[in-house]
Amino acid sequence: MNNSLVAVLAALCLNACTVSGGKEPDEGTEIDPLLSAQTLAYKTVGEAFLTPLTPADNIDSPASWTAPDGSVWLIATAKATDKLVVYDGDTGHTRTAAGGSGAKLGQFRRPNGIFVADDRVFVVERDNRRVQVLALPGLQPLGHFGEAQLSAPYGLWVDKTAQGYEVLVSDAYMDGEAVPPAAQLGHRFKRYRVRTDGGFHAAHLGDFGDTDAGGAVRIPESIWGDAKHGVLLLSEEDQHAGTQLKVYGRDYRYAGLTVGKG
């Protein structure tokens, strides 16, 4: 199936190094910085539609899938109500929802990042500390992985390979309530190989993350990759370090380049 994913990376205002209560690492203050107030060049894209306003869901990340009949589904994580919401990709109308609170297959706790590859949906669950995989179009759960390695997962990127799927997951583990020192940031991103043919199989391949000031990601969330050009874009959401994208190569090393520092 054809897949397109719209990734929106926004600058978020953070306090110096701490978070409190039920807030996430990228929710340190009540002030929401606006891109229009920054010096970065940007373009405004007009709205194609508006989905229903459901603030209780706290809709977070979207992914899209093209069904066999050509219709487009927009699948989003509802991190406050622990479910996936499926919208019509042409009108924005709600098609269906799936999930519910819990740790069983098909249930979620604080779903955040989402990615569609072929007819598979990969969903990061922060509070279950795992990634769950479901099959489209029925959203049947196939399996989950990552509990042994992940502490506070948020974003992910999936690359189809000859061995199945390579899955990269960001992990915003903390040192208590503080961002860890740079020397401890070498595990910010986890790598997995996942296969769903002939059963569900997942293996942890290792961790990566620069520990030098230039390439270290202090507060990670979204990940995006360009497999053709061998580039990974890793979001840095620490405002005091400068919200930006850190550019890594497919060798999982910092490429010495940042984009959009604000």
Residues covered by each model-derived region:
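Asp-box/WD-like beta-propeller blade repeats and closely related beta-sheet repeat scaffolds
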Residues: 129, 136-188, 201-214
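Short loop/turn segments that connect beta-strands within beta-propeller blades
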Residues: 88-91, 135-138, 194-197, 248-251
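C-terminal motif of bacterial Sec signal peptides marking the signal peptidase cleavage site
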Residues: 15-16
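Beta-strand-rich domains and repeat architectures in extracellular enzymes and scaffolds
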Residues: 48-83
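Beta-rich, blade/repeat-based domains predominating
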Residues: 54-68, 103-117, 148-161, 210-231, ...
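A short beta-strand motif characteristic of beta-propeller blades
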Residues: 46-55, 93-105, 140-146, 201-214, ...
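Conserved beta-strand positions in repeat-built beta-propeller and related beta-rich domains
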Residues: 74-80, 123-127, 167-183, 232-239
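A short helix->beta-strand "capping" segment at the edge of beta-propeller domains
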Residues: 31-57
